[in-house]
């Protein structure tokens, strides 16, 4: 799920209460404190601020503890600059879809490429059962992420079994793949988030380090995400302006997410 123009809206920190006059502009305060999980890996804690930008001119003025950026499009020099500013960097990678514009798109044989995902042009679902083909490609992506200096990985599209992918994917097959997605990141010393797939949180909680969920307030499943926040793990709730006004966000989402210790962000989504 990429090729979007993401626009951070004001607000996000639970500790800040999403207060003030929000606008679709940078300005999220940061919080001290990702705690080390191991000597080589860190884990974001509940309430930390995050800037997510996958496209467009990168804005490093946003005061956020963590930056989530496109892995292919972000240069190592940008990651170094973020580190010099005392920030962490997480790389976005789609592990469940084929994206025709990626430099390694030609490495995916036709046998693993399925239906269009229905939302984004040039993006198709992958047959995650064909691990002998997919794992080396994804490992190479992770290695590039690590080489660029990123601290973690944001693997998207890990719930294909819930969509019309063109393949008869089962929940069990998805679970197996998702566990590999997390384990492979850890093997490289990278932290990793669970992006959506809330139905498998209980099975994945001990594999992933934190959570990122799209529209949990609109969809009505934010409470499920407390499995992470109860362990003091960061959970980001992304709500979109195409279904959420700024006023409703401030008056409804912010207090609700504060109750669950989630970090809410309002974004503008454009193709």
Residue ranges and their predicted role:
Residues 15-17:
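C-terminal motif of bacterial Sec signal peptides marking the signal peptidase cleavage site
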Residues 11-12, 247:
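Residue-level signal for mature regions of secreted extracellular proteins and peptides
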